[in-house]
């Protein structure tokens, strides 16, 4: 009876390890497929999404607003 319980516990532990490693490998596989695929390569350009939101030049209205804000 003790042997059967030990075998059951060991089997459950190995099943959990396999299930977790399967999820890990499937996540890595899906990430690799998305990077290699045409859509994945096209989406790499979207990483620069914040480039348009930063304007290095300040207009006169911006300077006036900053002066009023800092008074």
Curated annotation (Swiss-Prot):
Tissue note: Expressed by the venom gland.
Organism per entry: Mesomexovis punctatus (Scorpion)
Recorded family membership: Belongs to the non-disulfide-bridged peptide (NDBP) superfamily. Short antimicrobial peptide (group 4) family.
Keywords: Amidation, Antibiotic, Antimicrobial, Cleavage on pair of basic residues, Cytolysis, Fungicide, Membrane, Secreted, Signal, Target cell membrane, Target membrane
Propiece residue ranges: 37-71
GO BP terms in the entry: defense response to bacterium; defense response to fungus; killing of cells of another organism
Subcellular location: Secreted; Target cell membrane
Signal peptide bounds: 1-23
Protein name according to UniProt: Antimicrobial peptide VpCT2
One Gene Ontology term, aspect cellular component: extracellular region
Coiled-coil residues: none
Disulfide bond annotation, renumbered to this chain: none
Function: Antimicrobial peptide with potent activity against bacteria S.aureus (MIC=6.25-12.5 uM), E.coli (MIC=50 uM) and yeast Candida albicans (MIC=25 uM) and Candida glabrata (MIC=25 uM). Is not very effective against P.aeruginosa (MIC=300 uM). Also provokes moderate hemolysis on human erythrocytes (HC(50)=10.8 uM).
Modification sites for Isoleucine amide: 36
